């Protein structure tokens, strides 16, 4: 099958990949190699003309938007943080579910004056506090968010919370719920026009697989 007819799906390693592969399998699409045991970045599948590329989670939207992939699976947190105006977002896959939260020591979010917020989600945090009319100082971090309140780097953090075990282990707790997060299927706008029939068919299969898992 020619490249013009091939569907390329961008996934990121980790929880999204682990949760997406069973959904694809429900649609009859399986990788021909185990991505966890391979250094390859492009994987063929059992369906001719459908392949998977593995990229960083934050790179899924630009790969899809600029034509490196026809479709992708990205967390709503990534789409909110980095923008998704150039993408179609037709389906909530209902996987990799968690919550975007403000967290910190009890009562830390009620302190008067400018709040110091440590996060890697600076755009989400900025919009959230702007809607509240609250003055904040945003401190960009790339990991170990829970450490910030412990060493006085920030009053609170804005981060993804799943079980909350890491927060509790460090004497922190969820303070404010910003939004629920799950992974979404995103589609390149040009691909949706040029490969409409194939993409529409895959969308239908995935929607059925998602619904079946909800039942």
Curated annotation (Swiss-Prot):
GO CC, alphabetical: cytoplasm
Coiled-coil intervals, chain numbering: none
GO annotation, biological process: L-histidine biosynthetic process
Location in or out of the cell: Cytoplasm
Subunit annotation: Heteromultimer composed of HisG and HisZ subunits.
Enzyme's top EC category: transferase
Entry's EC annotation: 2.4.2.17
Keywords, sorted A to Z: Amino-acid biosynthesis, ATP-binding, Cytoplasm, Glycosyltransferase, Histidine biosynthesis, Nucleotide-binding, Transferase
InterPro entries per the UniProt record, alphabetical: ATP_PRibTrfase_cat (IPR013820), ATP_PRibTrfase_CS (IPR018198), ATP_PRibTrfase_HisG (IPR001348), ATP_PRibTrfase_HisG_short (IPR024893)
GO function terms (MF aspect): ATP binding; ATP phosphoribosyltransferase activity
Catalytic activity: 1-(5-phospho-beta-D-ribosyl)-ATP + diphosphate = 5-phospho-alpha-D-ribose 1-diphosphate + ATP
Pathway assigned to this chain's UniProt record: Amino-acid biosynthesis; L-histidine biosynthesis; L-histidine from 5-phospho-alpha-D-ribose 1-diphosphate: step 1/9
Domain-related comment: Lacks the C-terminal regulatory region which is replaced by HisZ.
Domain of life assignment: Bacteria
Name this polypeptide is given: ATP phosphoribosyltransferase
PROSITE patterns xrefs: ATP_P_PHORIBOSYLTR
Family listed: Belongs to the ATP phosphoribosyltransferase family. Short subfamily.
Main location: cytoplasm
Pfam families for the chain: HisG
Organism ancestry: Bacteria, Pseudomonadati, Pseudomonadota, Gammaproteobacteria, Chromatiales
Naturally occurring in which organism (per UniProt): Alkalilimnicola ehrlichii (strain ATCC BAA-1101 / DSM 17681 / MLHE-1)
SUPFAM superfamilies: Periplasmic binding protein-like II
Task performed by this protein: Catalyzes the condensation of ATP and 5-phosphoribose 1-diphosphate to form N'-(5'-phosphoribosyl)-ATP (PR-ATP). Has a crucial role in the pathway because the rate of histidine biosynthesis seems to be controlled primarily by regulation of HisG enzymatic activity.
């Amino acid at each position: 099958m020619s490249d013009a007819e091939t569907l390329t799906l961008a996934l990121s390693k980790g929880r999204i990949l682990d949760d997406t592969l069973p959904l694809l399998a429900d649609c009859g699409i399986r990788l021909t190699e185990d991505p966890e045991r391979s250094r390859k970045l492009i994987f063929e599948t059992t369906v001719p003309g459908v392949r998977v590329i593995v990229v960083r989670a934050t790179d899924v939207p630009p790969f899809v938007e600029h034509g490196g992939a026809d479709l992708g699976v990205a967390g709503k947190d990534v789409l909110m943080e980095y923008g998704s105006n150039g993408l179609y977002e037709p389906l909530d896959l209902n996987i990799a579910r968690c919550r975007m939260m403000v967290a910190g020591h009890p009562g830390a979010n009620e302190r008067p004056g400018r709040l110091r917020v440590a996060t890697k989600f600076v755009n989400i945090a900025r919009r959230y506090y702007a809607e509240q009319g609250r003055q904040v100082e945003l401190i960009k971090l790339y990991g170990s968010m829970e450490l910030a309140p412990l060493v006085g780097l920030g009053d609170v953090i804005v981060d993804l919370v799943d079980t909350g075990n890491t927060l509790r282990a460090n004497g922190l707790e969820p303070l404010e719920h910003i939004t629920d997060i799950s992974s979404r299927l995103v589609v390149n706008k040009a691909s949706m026009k040029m490969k409409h029939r194939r993409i529409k068919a895959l969308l239908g299969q995935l929607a059925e697989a998602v619904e079946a898992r909800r039942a």
